[in-house]
Amino acid sequence: MRHGNGLRKLNRTSSHRLAMFRNMAVSLITHEAIKTTLPKAKELRRVVEPLITLGKEPTLANKRLAFARLRDRAAVVKLFAEIGPRYAARNGGYTRVLKMGFRQGDNAPMAYMELVDRPEVEETEADNAAE
């Protein structure tokens, strides 16, 4: 029977998992792309996608729900001001997980997680001068 197999435990306590995914969700919303291990990225989708769906409808109740889950005021403001309206016409599938090889030290599978349709980052003059 498959009872109790609803999520990946990732060898962490429930409070550690909650804090880790809260931090990762804030990082993803703030930077719109993060690098992490593949199992963490796959599990993070289950946290971030419902938050972006909340961000599409900026009611006070939705803002309070998002703040209760993220505990970061700047991330909630960005979620409702930028990210929610960007995905107003999209029904789910807001994130993309790209495999990027294995980590050098322990050979863990790594992944690059990003928001789809995110604006392209313009190269600065400092980057051009370095080349």
From Swiss-Prot:
Signal sequence coordinates: none
Keywords per UniProt: Ribonucleoprotein, Ribosomal protein
Organism name: Bordetella petrii (strain ATCC BAA-461 / DSM 12804 / CCUG 43448)
Family the UniProt entry places it in: Belongs to the bacterial ribosomal protein bL17 family.
Pfam families reported in the protein's UniProt record: Ribosomal_L17
Superkingdom, taxonomy of origin: Bacteria
One GO BP annotation of this record: translation
Name of this protein: Large ribosomal subunit protein bL17
One GO term describing the cellular component: cytosolic large ribosomal subunit
Name of the coding gene: rplQ
GO molecular function: structural constituent of ribosome
